[in-house]
Amino acid sequence: YIVIITQNSLEVWGIDGTQYTVNTPDGTSYLNESDPKGTFEAITIADYTFIINKNKTTAMSSSTGATRPYEAVYSCLQGVDQTEYNITINGTTYSTTTTTTASTYQTTEIVDSLITAIGALSGFTITDLGSDIYFSNTSDFTITSTDGYGNQASQVVKSTAQKFTDLPTKAVAGMVVEISGDDSNNFDNHYVKWVADSSTDEGYWQETVLGGLQNDFDTATMPHLLARQADGEFRFCESDGDTYTLSGTDYTLPLYGSRTVGDTVSAPEPSFIGQKISDIFFHRNRLGFIAGESVVMSRAG
């Protein structure tokens, strides 16, 4: 095939002189250049041709990841008889004391007694998780725990924990905690979220991304696609993962990846963001961009 790019237009011809239909659901503005010959580069991989506009500055999408309310989990780690358990929220302390009666120092009973002591706390959502209590609020709050067993029988995790083993064994679906790791640097920090299994009332912590970040590429500024379809026609568009059906055939366009874990320190934006991509290549099953003095390559796929 021969591809001809003009200002705001793209044509595909066969070597026999046949012109093929090119559908353009989006992306033609990417071709709005007065010097197509000096502006565009392309590389073909199987049924896809990636086209770059060397005058286009790449950017991240303005959309941001979801954010969470302020949240914390109090955990009763062990029940000890004749011991006081305390939770202090925004400066007010709520307490319960166990006795020598075994039922009073079961962890679930201690939690129930603390929830009763706290009562209806304005602005808070409070959830009984058995041996744990989940707190959330749209406004920030302070919360600490103490106990009469050297503060070894309870703990509170709010926003951060130093080690993975410090995390509570239960939480509410979607709760995010930062694992701070070594205090001497920020490079080993990572984030985990609670993934709940509703069928077992259990769950697990899974690595995730800090909320509120711009994690996706602005596909309007990234190299675009010319895709050959089974019906002989072509489709020029953004590489945005769009799915569509044509003549009974399902298509899924390639999609540039997103930041799925970490933050802007541990998983920074690629160096080509804010730059103009000057060339594109394919090497050992990896797509590569040249921007400024950097070469950035995809994972092997």
Predicted segments — roles?
Residues 64-65:
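Post-signal-peptide, soluble extracytosolic/periplasmic N-terminal scaffold domains
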